[in-house]
Amino acid sequence: MLVKTYSAAVNGLQVTTVTVEVSLIKGVMYHLTGLGDVAVREGRDRIAAAMQYNGMKFPRADITVNMAPADLKKEGSGFDLPLAIAILAADGQIPADSLGEYMMIGELGLDGKLQPAKGVLPIAIKARAEHFKGLIVPKHNEREAAIVNNIDVYGMDSLADVIALLSRQREYQPCVVDTRDEFYKQQYDFDLDFSDVRGQETVKRALEVAAAGGHNVIMIGPPGSGKSMMAKRLPSILPPLTLRESLETTQIHSVAGTLKQGSALISQRPFRAPHHTISEVALVGGGMNPMPGEISLSHNGVLFCDELPEFNKHTLEVLRQPLEDRQITISRAKYSVTYPASFMFVASMNPCPCGYYGDPTHHCVCTPGQIQRYLNKISGPLMDRIDIQCEISAIPFKELSKAQPGEPSANIRERVIAARAIQTRRYEGVAGVHCNAQMTEKMIHKYAEPDAAGLELLRTAMERLSLSARAYSRILKVARTIADLDGAEKVEPRHIAEAIGYRQLDRGDWAERGL
């Protein structure tokens, strides 16, 4: 008897429907065709143990399994469930009449329990597109899959439960998730708030500008000055995720297997802070079965690299392409995978190896050569992709104890949202441009060109402060954002002046002076 069940293979965010065909004839052999990897081939032993544990028999027959399309490599243990169901149906132990209505995925434990699977959300989207009536997934993943409308999602604990559903021995209700309620209920529920930060108003203003225009930012200052503290609070002032962004972000985390049990939509912008010992593969993604790296897990959110010069230089260099293209392509011999990687890059660093260069309360023990070598760990092309460079000094205890609580994140976020709304209208219909940080040179001349007074101020600053040529476009982009925060139609000299103040590392004399 020939029986078919349906599952799916995930390649990046692309999903292909897989037909599992099982034929039983007289004999004792087990044949698997269709480019299944080791985990798929080992599934036979897990399936046999699970059947025996649940009171069923593994057929004593010649079993031939084909997984179509045969030229697509099938990876992972998620094919255990559709394979087990197909074998049982081919052996006549369960009815086969409803198998064509369901797509299913799940790894079987030796006791028949269904283990969590990766990539369930994009699989659910594919199942709906293929017009399946239902999707059977492990209980762990049911809410993740149920955010997809117009398909019944059944979260099952075990092989026995799946058999009971398909045999109509028990009634099961599909999981229901109110997508909009799930999306809005935690959108503004932040654990960290800028009101916790006392002082540092200049740096908080720089982060507000960065959030308003989607600009990458680096903070330079001694240990204990609050760089990490403020970076961690940046998501609390960013515009809320749209429903489309939320779904896109959740898909990436679904493929990576980083969604928490019982969670559905990711409703807050991601904040990822990898350690400086991270490998290139962990940062950008990869592996035999290419998985998303930190830059893709930061998609629509923030990637924070603390102590930037401590990262491996080659690892940092691989950031250049995704910072420009806002996606990453991982190539293998027979295929390639592309993951989105549109994130705000936020970095922090000490001004020197000891950390206290220019600090009035500590003595720096570094030589000028050591300081220069330390700064040279960050290449020019990478620094060229960072719009805002701000210095930060430690606040003395006397001033810290007197400082009032900072402005709440909610107030800052209102201004940021208003500025982003201006940019949304400005770039409406322009592909790939949603905020000022993404402006092309042509757009800079159109939307950020200053008047004669502003141009004169910019020329004077570049000459007197020895600003590099690459700072010119960055200053105008940031000035446009500052103007948007002010609600100004044109970029004015005061906007240029503030933007110039955010190019600290571009000053030709930076390494020779105190902070």
Predicted features along the sequence, with ranges:
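Peripheral, non-AAA+ core regions of ATP-driven protein-machinery
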Residues: 1-218, 222-225, 331, 471-472, ...
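Short beta-strand elements
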Residues: 18-24, 283, 387-390
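Basic, amphipathic alpha-helical bundle interface domains used for macromolecular binding and assembly
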Residues: 33-44, 59, 66-76, 290, ...
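Walker A/P-loop
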Residues: 219-260, 325
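Walker B catalytic acidic pair
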Residues: 300, 306-307, 318
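The Walker A (P-loop) glycine that initiates the GxxxxGKT/S ATP-binding motif of P-loop NTPases
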Residues: 221, 285, 307
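P-loop NTPase nucleotide-binding/switch module
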Residues: 170-209, 213, 240-295
